Regions:
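Short alpha-helical donor nucleotide-sugar binding micro-motif in glycosyltransferases
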Residues: 240-241, 248-253
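Conserved acidic donor-binding segment of nucleotide-sugar-dependent glycosyltransferases
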Residues: 293-294, 298-305, 314-319
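Active-site proximal beta-strand in glycosyltransferases
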Residues: 69-71, 83-101, 129
Length: 352
């Protein structure tokens, strides 16, 4: 089959975040199975993302995709879909109407506009793919899509690629227990809760260290909170890094923490488990579907630095528990291998 992937999300790990990773992993997996994939990316950028997304979609009307099946990611395809001549699948990597609930001000207002476009997109699609049962429920409840038109296809991970990167990564000698977090700095990621947790944890584990990979609109506010808590070199902000450098951070950490209160899936959780890291995260949104509590790590109530600190201490001070969670995490990550997820995608797309 020939697929046209429609996406106005920047195709770079720096700006596209987990959406970029998921699209690229799926593209490679489908091509490995003998299918053709043409990505129709965003080419012209004004600096105003919502405007760019509308212009991109207007352009699809003027130059329609040529394929057996078109796949529009998130809101993409919403203008073209009403006059399409080929099957159309809407693949939602995150539900915009759900994500905006944790945003503020101008960002929330712009996301509200995008959510209306996404609603139109899923209404016009022959099939709607989501990454988790949680997202399926949100799409049915908020966008009014009947459950029979929705299929769950999780995010894929290229285990062979990551295992190669882990094997080549530099191991740095360190006596300090190290926590790693990888996230775009949005309010919904709740990284301030992790900073608070580290401040509490230092009273019990004075040498604990937190490395944060990622950037975003909350960056300045997090730096100010870091200073106010007096965390000093206990926290390192690494910004955006290459995949090779990210692999190095994974193999040099003792534990992975993502305190997010809203995740449609959480592809970084797969990456961390593939690296054998025990997970501490929040019992929120789709996270429990990816991280079984007490099997690959610990899930705690959202917005609770105290419970985060307790769970982190439990893992960092128990080497046997770290190993058991890490081994289980590797097995769990293997359940989302890219070839298997690509097959699930194909089955769902053929029903469009």
């Amino acid at each position: 089959m020939k697929f046209a992937f429609l996406t106005s999300t920047p195709l770079s790990p720096t700006e596209g975040s987990g959406t970029f990773v998921g699209i690229r992993e799926l593209e490679r997996a489908l091509e490995a199975l003998g299918h053709a994939v043409e990505i129709r990316p965003l080419r012209v950028r004004s600096g105003f993302h919502t405007l760019d997304r509308w212009l991109y979609n207007a352009g699809l009307v003027l130059a329609p995709p040529d394929a057996d099946v078109a796949v529009g990611f998130d809101l993409d395809g919403f203008l073209w879909a009403r006059r399409r001549r080929i099957p159309f699948v809407a693949s939602l990597k995150g539900i915009i109407a759900d994500e905006l609930l944790n945003e503020r001000g101008r960002t929330r207002a712009l996301l509200s506009i995008q959510a209306r476009w996404e609603r139109r997109n899923v209404a016009r699609a022959d099939r709607v793919l989501v990454t988790s049962r949680y997202c399926a429920g949100v799409v049915e409840r908020v966008y009014g899509v009947p459950s029979k038109r929705i299929a769950v296809v999780p995010e894929p991970i290229d285990l062979e690629d990551w295992q190669g990167r882990f094997a080549r990564a530099l191991r740095r000698p360190s006596e300090r227990p190290t926590i790693l977090s990888v996230a775009r700095m949005y309010p919904r990621k709740r990284l301030e809760d992790l900073l608070e947790a580290v401040a509490l944890l230092r009273r019990r584990l004075p040498d604990v260290r937190l490395s944060i990979v990622g950037d975003g609109p909350e960056g300045d506010r997090l730096l100010r909170r870091h200073a106010a808590l007096g965390l000093g070199d206990a926290v390192v902000f690494l910004g955006e890094v290459s995949r090779n450098r990210l692999a190095e951070e994974y193999v040099n950490a003792d534990c992975f923490c993502l305190p997010s209160v809203q995740e449609g899936f959480g592809i970084v959780l797969l990456e961390a488990m593939a690296a054998g890291l025990p997970i501490v995260a929040c019992r929120a949104a789709a996270v429990p579907e990816v991280v079984p509590d007490g099997v690959t790590g610990r899930l705690v109530e959202p917005r609770s630095p105290e419970r985060l600190a307790d769970a982190l201490e439990e893992i960092l001070t128990d080497s046997r528990r770290r190993k058991d969670y890490g081994d289980a995490g590797r097995r769990r990550a293997a359940e989302f291998s890219a070839p298997g997820v690509a097959q699930r995608f194909l089955e769902a797309a053929r029903e469009a």
